[in-house]
Amino acid sequence: DLEGLVIPGEALRPICLAVGGRHMEIKDAHYLWGLDVQHVGKRLRRMFPGSGHRSILRIGPAGENGSAMACINADTYRHFGRMGGGGVMGSKNLKAIIIQGTESFDLPESKAYPKLFQSVYEKMTATDMMSKYHNLGTPVNLEALNELKCLPWRNLKQSTDPEISEISGEAFADETLLRNTACSGCPVGCIHIGFVREQFDDPHHFLYRQVNYDYEPIFSMGTMLGITDKFQVLSLMDEVEKAGLDVMSAGVALAWATEAAEKGILSEKETLAPLVFGDAKPYAEAVRHLGAGANDFYRLLGQGALKAADHYGGADFACVLGQEMAGYATGEVFFTAQAHGLRHSHLDSGGYAYDQVHEDKDPESAIDFLVRDEAERAFLTSMVSCLFARGVYKKDLLSECLGTLGYTVLADSMDDIGRTIQALRWRTRSEERRVG
């Protein structure tokens, strides 16, 4: 069994790596270099059959060009989105990694396992615990955060706008939703696939493209850019997907560039398109330029909004918390958590949720919560758990699941292991700062 895959060095030419239970192959991929994420996926699925037993990780032009906001696409609808993993693959001339499963694990023979499995399955599918994620999905949060004045609009010049009704979770579901799908083996179906229709010939010849949507992409390609047409938002998401960019960093960086253009810091000479809040067409061009590193400005912006601001000016309105902010303007605890976390990720602790339910402004209580919540999430993440299911996999249930599988020592040590992982993360962060 492979527990980890480490790929040192750099290939002499573009390659893809195919890994299976009994094989590891390096295949020439020069003909894939320069292709967008979607075209690469189509070709690789034909080359490596085995849907449901195969995972394809791939990058787009942004990764090839070394962008710090290049993502790694995982099986089309999911991503290693943040921290520039796509740029790391690109630096190695590694266009894709294909992992093919050939074996299965034996299930426990005890009567406890099927009984517990059924209980967990019912929690996932027949209770309210996960219904939010299946029904409207994470976009259900858009209207709620907008009402609380916690939703970033137009580079955070506003935190609420009545036009949210045009791009709410309900609006996307009513007018754009094609279907739900799920990660392999998951019964929830939280992936929401919308459609974009495009006329390619007169009089009535259309094609449609399928685009997955969630809260964060709608924030970054919608509210942050002032776009309130849901189909335009989906079209921008589609451009981001093809380029292989992290949608949050791309949207927030372009929002900064738009305000910089408003203030006269940037001109169309740099942006190559007239960026204006609410105008989707120039943003589609800008996303392509950002992925391609079309000029000096876009190559610098691809290293992060602060990098560009350091060169051109405008750092005071760059919405960056270590990396471009996530879609929450909930308050001090969220801002602190993302700014100081190891990955500068809103998912490392629930600071955004803490702000919404605590008005006491007590720093000690907030810090205690962040430390405790980070350790619990670190353990869940190390289990390769979906954080959407954290409400189901509470400590007692997770311990019972591990025990039923025979991992009794692990089941009895979850708190200690979570704190150990957390300590390793903090040590890594300290070492990064010393090197930096």
Residue ranges and their predicted role:
Residues 45-83, 89-430, 434:
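Extended C-terminal regions of large enzymes
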Residues 4, 29-33, 225, 294:
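Short secondary-structure transition/capping motifs
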Residues 17-64:
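Acidic/Gly/His-enriched mid-domain segments of enzyme catalytic cores or analogous surface patches
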Residues 2-26, 86-90, 97, 106, ...:
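Hydrophobic or amphipathic alpha-helical targeting/insertion segments
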